[in-house]
Amino acid sequence: MSPQTETKASVGFKAGVKDYKLTYYTPEYKPLDTDILAAFRVTPQPGVPSEEAGAAVAAESSTGTWTTVWTDGLTSLDRYKGRCYHIDPVPGEDNQYICYVAYPLHLFEEGSVTNIFTSIVGNVFGFKALRALRLEDLRIPIAYIKTFQGPPHGIQVERDKLNKYGRKILGCTIKPKLGLSAKNYGRAVYECLRGGLDFTKDDENVNSQPFMRWRDRFCFSAEAIYKAQAETGEIKGHYLNATAGTCEEMIKRAVFARELGVPIVMHDYLTGGFTANTSLSHYCRDNGLLLHIHRAMHAVIDRQKNHGMHFRVLAKALRLSGGDHIHAGTVVGKLEGERDITLGFVDLLRDDYTEIDDQRGIYFTQSWASTPGVLPVASGGIHVWHMPALTEIFGDDSVLQFGGGTLGHPWGNAPGAVANRVALEACVQARNEGRDLAKEGNTIIRDAAKWSPELAAACEVWKEIKFEFPAVDVLDKKKK
């Protein structure tokens, strides 16, 4: 090792401030299979070299501080420090770089997403030498992945529990999201499930407010589930939101859901926190409950291109912490999400192994070993005319959540559910027959509407509804 990167006690202590790059920029370093690797989008302040900025990120997110301290001599920092080992300029940007940092596995507590993020996306994001900083991707080594339980059950086990194969899972978020009484809420759940949906969902805003306490909602929703199951012969469920102000209260709600015999509960994993989410995931596996995950607050963290954390990192963190579903954007609906980027983190959720893919924004190869996959959920501003595109984009292993696209049907909730189920079945049949959903999608929906008055009415209501705004977070492209 070169003298300038040597930090062992034998060097001796010399007080003062030195450049980060003398210790933490190590372009000769070859990452180990056990290292956690991070790709940061770094925007230095004017006059700060990229090497110093990248080294500062490595230092401040691992063992470094702003000055030399004598206690450095009491340990081997070369064993524990983060290393900025490679820097690429961002195409099309004058002062922006992708800095790759390797972290030794010794730095992190086993099975703790909370500890990973406390270090890697902690105080360094407020560092004055940086104008902006964004964590674009992480490579989690198998040695660390195996310290996590991961999703409670995974895709195949969920399909077996529900006895649903060969198509997407179809759901609906109950609206209005706030203000319904528990009994009226249960009525809406029943009507949607009876009409052909597999699941209904608590809106993420619904916890236990004065107008509808959680226990009442759980009871009326369970009654709706059992009634719809008896009438349709299909397994049904409702995502009962167990998110609460304390972990103890959250688990209490999950316990009550299990006692009711329902198949699934729900958690807001970002607002609730990773520690709470991991605890709930463990409870769900131990007690046979599926776990639906909502990502409320994600856009605060991931929407800006130059600062924060990309959702692909949050998706990987969720697969570690645990969840059987997670909302992942729609591409075609009202919420942010470019197609290639969205499919990139959909791959990270479902597949056992993903390669580096510049076209999908994947910076590292990632193996998940035996960790179960997570079903991506498309939700937000989608309706029957979107069904061909959603079927083509996401494939069978996904969940479609139509809120307004079900409850906004002019004939009521059950006909809205019928319209969505007919549209889905028509698209699946057309795909299985070899038809091109991208080119023939509208024709497929119109043909199905000829024998389904519910679908015909839905088509008429939403024929002009589009959300054509450019995505904020897009792939980097070179300036012409």
Swiss-Prot record:
Assigned keywords, A-Z: Acetylation, Calvin cycle, Carbon dioxide fixation, Chloroplast, Disulfide bond, Lyase, Magnesium, Metal-binding, Methylation, Monooxygenase, Oxidoreductase, Photorespiration, Photosynthesis, Plastid
The EC number(s) this enzyme carries: 4.1.1.39
Enzymatic reactions: 2 (2R)-3-phosphoglycerate + 2 H(+) = D-ribulose 1,5-bisphosphate + CO2 + H2O; D-ribulose 1,5-bisphosphate + O2 = 2-phosphoglycolate + (2R)-3-phosphoglycerate + 2 H(+)
Cofactor note: Binds 1 Mg(2+) ion per subunit.
Site (Transition state stabilizer): 334
Protein residues bound to Mg(2+): 201, 203-204
Positions of the pro-segment in this chain: 1-2
GO cellular component: chloroplast
Source organism superkingdom: Eukaryota
Record-level GO BP terms: photorespiration; reductive pentose-phosphate cycle
Modification sites for N6,N6,N6-trimethyllysine: 14
Modified residues (N-acetylproline): 3
Post-translation changes: The disulfide bond which can form in the large chain dimeric partners within the hexadecamer appears to be associated with oxidative stress and protein turnover.
Pfam families in the cross-refs: RuBisCO_large, RuBisCO_large_N
Cofactors that this protein relies on: Mg(2+)
Family: Belongs to the RuBisCO large chain family. Type I subfamily.
Protein's recorded name: Ribulose bisphosphate carboxylase large chain
Originating species: Trianthema portulacastrum
Lineage: Eukaryota, Viridiplantae, Streptophyta, Embryophyta, Tracheophyta
